[in-house]
């Protein structure tokens, strides 16, 4: 699922994406990919020039893989989020990619998150940012 968020009057607004051309008219601050399909990954690569590593949410999380910076200015961060289900607690890995410096790329100023399942804290952030104007000003605030 490809969730794209823009800012409108200081509030986070979700925009539905059904095809690649939908991305052309947007200036998002956050592109959240929950279990993205190959097609959705292709759209992101084609429009933003962003290559999503195949192991973005993989199990191997050596210290060097948790944070690194690409030559083009993209910062890659992998972090685990705790899910506390009724039966058990577990962690879910999320990969983040942020480019704040390279203005030559369409990805500049956009936070990309890649995850395999829904994470409650992401829902909570979206709800708060929709209701509270000015809570989020840019991709770094997400």
Task: Please annotate each region the language model reported.
Residues 1-142:
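Peripheral, non-transmembrane regulatory/ligand-interaction domains of membrane transport proteins
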């Amino acid at each position: 699922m490809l969730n794209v968020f823009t800012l409108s009057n200081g509030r986070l607004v979700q925009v539905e994406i059904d095809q690649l051309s939908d991305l052309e008219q947007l200036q998002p601050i956050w592109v959240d990919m929950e279990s993205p399909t190959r097609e959705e990954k292709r759209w992101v690569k084609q429009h933003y020039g962003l290559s999503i590593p195949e192991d973005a949410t993989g199990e191997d999380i050596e210290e060097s893989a948790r944070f690194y910076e690409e030559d083009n200015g993209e910062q890659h961060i992998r972090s685990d989020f705790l899910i506390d289900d009724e039966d058990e607690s577990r962690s879910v890995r999320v990969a983040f990619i942020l480019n704040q410096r390279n203005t030559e790329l369409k990805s500049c100023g956009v936070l990309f998150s890649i995850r395999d399942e829904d994470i409650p804290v992401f829902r909570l952030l979206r709800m708060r940012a929709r209701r509270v104007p000015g809570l989020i000003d840019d991709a770094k605030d997400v």
